[in-house]
Amino acid sequence: LFHAARCGLGALGVITKVKIRTVPAFSLEQRTTVEPLDGILENIENEKAANRNFEFLAFPHTSMALVVRTNEVDPSAPLISAGEEDPTAIFQIRDAYQSLGVLPLVGKFAYQKIIDSAADGAATVKSGPSYTVLAHDRVVPFREMEYTVPAEAGPECLKEILATIVEKDIPVIFPIEYRYTQQDDIWLSMFSQRDGCSISVHQFADEDYVEYFAAIEPIFHKYEGRPHWGKLHTLGPQEFSNLYPHWQDFLSVRERVDPKGRMLNSHLKHLFGLGGSSHA
Protein backbone atom coordinates (compact mmCIF):
# COMPACT_ATOMS: atom_id res chain seq x y z
CA LEU A 1 0.00 0.00 0.00
CA PHE A 2 2.84 2.42 0.83
CA HIS A 3 4.44 2.02 -2.61
CA ALA A 4 1.11 2.67 -4.33
CA ALA A 5 0.02 5.55 -2.10
CA ARG A 6 3.16 7.62 -2.63
CA CYS A 7 1.54 8.58 -5.93
CA GLY A 8 -2.01 7.39 -5.39
CA LEU A 9 -3.92 9.83 -7.63
CA GLY A 10 -6.44 10.27 -4.81
CA ALA A 11 -7.78 6.77 -5.50
CA LEU A 12 -6.61 4.88 -2.42
CA GLY A 13 -8.44 6.64 0.39
CA VAL A 14 -7.86 9.66 2.61
CA ILE A 15 -4.36 10.26 4.02
CA THR A 16 -4.65 11.74 7.51
CA LYS A 17 -1.01 11.87 8.60
CA VAL A 18 2.25 12.38 6.72
CA LYS A 19 5.80 12.28 8.11
CA ILE A 20 8.39 14.03 5.94
CA ARG A 21 12.16 13.80 6.20
CA THR A 22 13.67 17.27 5.76
CA VAL A 23 17.14 18.74 5.24
CA PRO A 24 18.67 21.75 7.00
CA ALA A 25 17.62 25.13 5.61
CA PHE A 26 19.77 26.33 2.72
CA SER A 27 20.14 29.31 0.42
CA LEU A 28 20.18 29.50 -3.36
CA GLU A 29 21.33 31.80 -6.12
CA GLN A 30 19.36 31.81 -9.37
CA ARG A 31 20.78 33.28 -12.59
CA THR A 32 18.47 33.84 -15.56
CA THR A 33 19.71 34.64 -19.07
CA VAL A 34 18.46 34.51 -22.66
CA GLU A 35 20.76 32.40 -24.85
CA PRO A 36 20.81 30.61 -28.23
CA LEU A 37 19.01 27.28 -27.93
CA ASP A 38 21.47 25.32 -30.08
CA GLY A 39 24.34 26.10 -27.74
CA ILE A 40 22.33 25.03 -24.72
CA LEU A 41 21.40 21.67 -26.23
CA GLU A 42 24.96 21.02 -27.40
CA ASN A 43 26.22 21.55 -23.85
CA ILE A 44 23.27 19.99 -22.04
CA GLU A 45 25.18 17.24 -20.19
CA ASN A 46 27.68 19.74 -18.80
CA GLU A 47 24.84 22.03 -17.71
CA LYS A 48 23.14 19.17 -15.86
CA ALA A 49 26.37 18.26 -14.09
CA ALA A 50 27.38 21.82 -13.21
CA ASN A 51 24.11 23.06 -11.68
CA ARG A 52 21.93 21.98 -8.78
CA ASN A 53 18.88 22.86 -10.85
CA PHE A 54 18.92 23.55 -14.56
CA GLU A 55 15.97 24.38 -16.77
CA PHE A 56 15.07 26.55 -19.70
CA LEU A 57 12.09 27.83 -21.64
CA ALA A 58 12.38 27.67 -25.42
CA PHE A 59 10.62 30.42 -27.38
CA PRO A 60 8.70 28.95 -30.36
CA HIS A 61 9.43 30.47 -33.79
CA THR A 62 12.81 31.74 -32.52
CA SER A 63 16.28 30.33 -31.92
CA MET A 64 16.47 31.47 -28.29
CA ALA A 65 15.62 30.23 -24.80
CA LEU A 66 15.32 31.65 -21.29
CA VAL A 67 17.86 29.72 -19.20
CA VAL A 68 17.58 29.33 -15.42
CA ARG A 69 20.54 28.04 -13.39
CA THR A 70 20.10 27.58 -9.64
CA ASN A 71 22.85 26.66 -7.17
CA GLU A 72 23.44 26.62 -3.43
CA VAL A 73 25.29 29.54 -1.84
CA ASP A 74 26.53 30.37 1.64
CA PRO A 75 23.52 31.35 3.80
CA SER A 76 25.55 34.32 5.06
CA ALA A 77 25.92 35.73 1.54
CA PRO A 78 24.10 39.03 0.90
CA LEU A 79 20.54 38.70 -0.38
CA ILE A 80 20.01 39.76 -3.99
CA SER A 81 16.60 40.81 -5.25
CA ALA A 82 15.79 40.41 -8.93
CA GLY A 83 13.21 43.18 -8.71
CA GLU A 84 9.53 43.00 -9.48
CA GLU A 85 8.47 40.88 -12.45
CA ASP A 86 5.95 42.39 -14.86
CA PRO A 87 3.07 39.88 -14.93
CA THR A 88 1.64 41.52 -18.06
CA ALA A 89 4.83 41.21 -20.14
CA ILE A 90 3.82 38.03 -21.95
CA PHE A 91 0.41 39.54 -22.77
CA GLN A 92 2.14 42.60 -24.23
CA ILE A 93 4.30 40.36 -26.42
CA ARG A 94 1.22 38.41 -27.53
CA ASP A 95 -0.66 41.59 -28.40
CA ALA A 96 2.26 42.85 -30.46
CA TYR A 97 2.56 39.51 -32.24
CA GLN A 98 -1.16 39.28 -32.97
CA SER A 99 -1.43 42.90 -34.10
CA LEU A 100 0.78 41.93 -37.02
CA GLY A 101 -1.34 38.90 -37.85
CA VAL A 102 -2.15 40.25 -41.30
CA LEU A 103 1.59 40.24 -41.94
CA PRO A 104 2.68 36.96 -40.33
CA LEU A 105 6.28 37.15 -41.52
CA VAL A 106 6.60 40.63 -40.07
CA GLY A 107 5.03 39.44 -36.82
CA LYS A 108 7.50 36.57 -36.47
CA PHE A 109 10.41 38.86 -37.33
CA ALA A 110 9.32 41.37 -34.69
CA TYR A 111 8.87 38.57 -32.14
CA GLN A 112 12.38 37.27 -32.84
CA LYS A 113 13.77 40.79 -32.43
CA ILE A 114 12.05 41.17 -29.05
CA ILE A 115 13.63 37.93 -27.84
CA ASP A 116 17.02 38.80 -29.35
CA SER A 117 17.03 42.14 -27.54
CA ALA A 118 16.54 40.34 -24.24
CA ALA A 119 19.66 38.28 -24.96
CA ASP A 120 21.71 41.48 -25.08
CA GLY A 121 20.94 42.26 -21.45
CA ALA A 122 22.84 41.18 -18.35
CA ALA A 123 21.84 38.12 -16.36
CA THR A 124 19.05 38.53 -13.83
CA VAL A 125 20.25 37.29 -10.44
CA LYS A 126 18.44 36.68 -7.19
CA SER A 127 19.50 34.87 -4.03
CA GLY A 128 18.16 34.06 -0.60
CA PRO A 129 16.51 31.25 1.37
CA SER A 130 15.52 28.39 -0.93
CA TYR A 131 11.78 28.91 -0.50
CA THR A 132 12.05 32.51 -1.73
CA VAL A 133 14.14 31.60 -4.79
CA LEU A 134 12.33 28.49 -5.99
CA ALA A 135 8.81 29.85 -5.57
CA HIS A 136 7.28 31.80 -8.46
CA ASP A 137 3.92 33.51 -8.77
CA ARG A 138 1.75 32.21 -11.62
CA VAL A 139 -0.57 35.05 -12.60
CA VAL A 140 -1.11 34.18 -16.29
CA PRO A 141 -4.05 31.77 -16.81
CA PHE A 142 -3.08 28.98 -19.19
CA ARG A 143 -3.70 25.37 -20.16
CA GLU A 144 -0.82 22.93 -20.10
CA MET A 145 0.25 19.53 -21.36
CA GLU A 146 3.39 18.07 -19.79
CA TYR A 147 5.11 14.79 -20.57
CA THR A 148 8.28 13.29 -19.13
CA VAL A 149 10.44 11.42 -21.64
CA PRO A 150 13.63 9.46 -20.88
CA ALA A 151 16.35 11.99 -20.05
CA GLU A 152 18.52 11.05 -23.01
CA ALA A 153 15.61 11.64 -25.41
CA GLY A 154 14.90 15.18 -24.21
CA PRO A 155 16.88 17.21 -26.78
CA GLU A 156 15.56 15.33 -29.82
CA CYS A 157 12.00 15.44 -28.51
CA LEU A 158 12.20 19.21 -28.02
CA LYS A 159 13.73 19.75 -31.46
CA GLU A 160 10.89 17.80 -33.06
CA ILE A 161 8.28 19.81 -31.15
CA LEU A 162 9.78 23.12 -32.23
CA ALA A 163 10.12 21.93 -35.84
CA THR A 164 6.48 20.81 -35.86
CA ILE A 165 5.33 24.21 -34.62
CA VAL A 166 7.17 25.84 -37.52
CA GLU A 167 6.12 23.29 -40.15
CA LYS A 168 2.45 23.50 -39.18
CA ASP A 169 2.71 27.27 -38.67
CA ILE A 170 1.09 27.02 -35.24
CA PRO A 171 0.62 30.58 -33.89
CA VAL A 172 1.98 30.06 -30.39
CA ILE A 173 4.41 32.25 -28.46
CA PHE A 174 4.06 30.69 -24.99
CA PRO A 175 7.52 29.32 -24.05
CA ILE A 176 8.09 25.56 -23.85
CA GLU A 177 9.43 24.46 -20.47
CA TYR A 178 12.28 21.94 -20.27
CA ARG A 179 13.83 20.45 -17.11
CA TYR A 180 15.37 17.27 -15.66
CA THR A 181 14.58 15.10 -12.63
CA GLN A 182 16.42 12.03 -11.32
CA GLN A 183 14.68 8.67 -11.25
CA ASP A 184 12.84 7.32 -8.22
CA ASP A 185 11.14 4.05 -7.22
CA ILE A 186 7.57 5.34 -6.88
CA TRP A 187 5.20 3.11 -8.85
CA LEU A 188 3.24 5.79 -10.72
CA SER A 189 5.84 8.55 -10.69
CA MET A 190 6.71 10.02 -14.08
CA PHE A 191 10.32 9.34 -13.08
CA SER A 192 9.80 5.74 -11.97
CA GLN A 193 12.93 3.69 -12.70
CA ARG A 194 14.34 6.18 -15.22
CA ASP A 195 15.86 9.67 -15.21
CA GLY A 196 13.37 12.01 -16.83
CA CYS A 197 13.20 15.13 -18.95
CA SER A 198 9.92 16.99 -18.49
CA ILE A 199 8.72 19.10 -21.41
CA SER A 200 5.63 21.28 -21.11
CA VAL A 201 3.63 23.06 -23.79
CA HIS A 202 1.21 25.84 -22.82
CA GLN A 203 -1.48 27.98 -24.36
CA PHE A 204 -3.26 31.04 -22.99
CA ALA A 205 -6.52 30.11 -21.27
CA ASP A 206 -8.52 32.38 -23.57
CA GLU A 207 -7.14 30.76 -26.74
CA ASP A 208 -7.90 27.42 -28.38
CA TYR A 209 -5.37 24.79 -27.35
CA VAL A 210 -6.88 21.64 -28.91
CA GLU A 211 -5.24 21.76 -32.34
CA TYR A 212 -1.86 22.74 -30.90
CA PHE A 213 -1.79 20.01 -28.26
CA ALA A 214 -3.09 17.43 -30.74
CA ALA A 215 -0.15 18.19 -33.03
CA ILE A 216 2.41 17.85 -30.24
CA GLU A 217 1.13 14.91 -28.17
CA PRO A 218 2.08 12.20 -30.74
CA ILE A 219 5.68 13.41 -30.48
CA PHE A 220 5.65 12.72 -26.74
CA HIS A 221 4.23 9.27 -27.45
CA LYS A 222 7.01 8.59 -29.96
CA TYR A 223 9.60 9.17 -27.22
CA GLU A 224 7.76 7.02 -24.63
CA GLY A 225 6.59 10.04 -22.66
CA ARG A 226 4.60 9.74 -19.44
CA PRO A 227 1.99 12.48 -18.98
CA HIS A 228 1.70 14.59 -15.86
CA TRP A 229 -1.28 13.18 -13.95
CA GLY A 230 -2.72 16.61 -13.21
CA LYS A 231 -2.45 18.10 -16.69
CA LEU A 232 -4.05 17.58 -20.08
CA HIS A 233 -3.46 14.35 -21.99
CA THR A 234 -5.44 11.72 -23.90
CA LEU A 235 -3.95 8.43 -22.66
CA GLY A 236 -5.83 5.51 -21.14
CA PRO A 237 -5.18 2.21 -19.33
CA GLN A 238 -3.58 0.38 -22.25
CA GLU A 239 -0.92 3.04 -22.72
CA PHE A 240 -0.26 3.26 -18.99
CA SER A 241 0.23 -0.50 -18.71
CA ASN A 242 3.06 -0.15 -21.24
CA LEU A 243 4.58 2.96 -19.65
CA TYR A 244 4.61 1.88 -15.99
CA PRO A 245 6.19 -1.44 -14.91
CA HIS A 246 4.06 -1.48 -11.73
CA TRP A 247 0.75 -0.45 -13.34
CA GLN A 248 -0.96 -3.78 -12.64
CA ASP A 249 0.43 -3.82 -9.10
CA PHE A 250 -1.17 -0.43 -8.50
CA LEU A 251 -4.52 -1.57 -9.90
CA SER A 252 -4.47 -4.61 -7.62
CA VAL A 253 -3.85 -2.46 -4.54
CA ARG A 254 -6.60 -0.03 -5.57
CA GLU A 255 -9.09 -2.88 -6.02
CA ARG A 256 -8.17 -4.28 -2.61
CA VAL A 257 -8.53 -1.04 -0.62
CA ASP A 258 -11.55 0.35 -2.50
CA PRO A 259 -13.45 -2.55 -4.10
CA LYS A 260 -16.63 -0.49 -4.50
CA GLY A 261 -14.85 2.41 -6.21
CA ARG A 262 -16.00 5.03 -3.74
CA MET A 263 -12.87 7.11 -4.30
CA LEU A 264 -13.22 7.16 -8.09
CA ASN A 265 -14.60 9.96 -10.24
CA SER A 266 -15.32 9.66 -13.95
CA HIS A 267 -11.77 10.62 -14.94
CA LEU A 268 -10.13 8.05 -12.66
CA LYS A 269 -12.49 5.35 -13.91
CA HIS A 270 -11.29 6.10 -17.42
CA LEU A 271 -7.63 5.91 -16.39
CA PHE A 272 -8.14 2.54 -14.72
CA GLY A 273 -10.21 1.03 -17.54
CA LEU A 274 -13.48 1.08 -15.61
CA GLY A 275 -15.50 3.26 -17.99
CA GLY A 276 -15.85 6.95 -17.23
CA SER A 277 -14.64 9.93 -19.22
CA SER A 278 -11.17 10.99 -20.35
CA HIS A 279 -11.78 14.52 -19.02
CA ALA A 280 -11.37 15.37 -15.35
Report each predicted region and the residues it spans.
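Noncatalytic alpha-helical scaffold of FAD-dependent oxidoreductases
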Residues: 1-280
